[in-house]
């Protein structure tokens, strides 16, 4: 990896992206396409009914371009030991001004599910939200049957704010979602208690 690539990948707004003992965050590059698409394709069963897997090279290219234009914050979750892409997180619809908020989505790929990689990665993503981007609020919308994801945000300190019937169309069906959120004040309280 060139020094230029390393800087683009491991920084956001000129600040280093956070690392944990087992995972670190980095921004995607076009050269990640083969691994990223293969991980998505291998995760079809895991994602069934939750999100369509991203397997189209053109869609991945457009995603990376949006990330590098600053239209969305895309983060790959990579394993420290071998740099494998184990998952990803995205911050979208970032609104500044008096709202200072974003929506967050995330996923872990097969065969890395149920190994607590996202339990380590989510607090790193929250550091990006509240320390690097200096947002006041982040929201995650989760289908009620996605118990592992609900457990993940609960452990991270999110609170349930509401229920949105027929919120998002996935797999040709409108799906209900629970609205989970965290504010900067909640993040400070959670960070102090750990």
Identify the residue ranges that each predicted region occupies.
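Conserved GNAT-fold acetyl-CoA-binding loop/helix
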Residues: 45-64
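Juxtamembrane/interface motifs at transmembrane-helix termini
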Residues: 55-58, 68, 107-108
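A generic secondary-structure signal
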Residues: 63-66, 128
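A short helix-loop-beta-strand connector motif used in the catalytic cores of GNAT acetyltransferases and
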Residues: 65-76
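Acyl-donor (CoA/ACP) binding surface of acyl/acetyltransferases
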Residues: 1-35, 39-44, 74, 78-194
């Amino acid at each position: 990896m060139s020094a230029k690539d390393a800087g683009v990948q491991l920084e956001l707004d000129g600040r280093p992206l956070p690392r944990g003992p087992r995972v670190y965050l980095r921004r995607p590059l076009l050269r990640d396409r083969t691994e990223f698409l293969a991980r998505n394709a291998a995760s079809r069963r895991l994602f069934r009914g939750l999100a369509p897997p991203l397997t189209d090279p053109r869609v991945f290219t457009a995603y990376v371009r949006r990330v590098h234009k600053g239209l969305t914050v895309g983060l790959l979750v990579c394993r420290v030991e071998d740099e494998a892409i184990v998952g990803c997180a995205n911050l979208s619809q970032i609104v500044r001004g008096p709202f200072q908020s974003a929506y967050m989505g995330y996923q872990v790929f097969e065969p890395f599910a149920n190994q607590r990689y996202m339990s380590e990665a989510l607090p790193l993503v929250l550091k990006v939200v509240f320390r690097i981007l200096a947002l006041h609020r982040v929201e995650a919308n989760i289908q009620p049957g996605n118990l592992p994801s609900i457990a993940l945000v609960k452990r991270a300190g999110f609170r349930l704010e509401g229920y949105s019937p027929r919120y998002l169309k996935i797999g040709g069906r409108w799906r209900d979602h629970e609205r989970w959120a965290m504010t900067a004040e909640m993040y400070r309280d959670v960070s102090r208690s750990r």
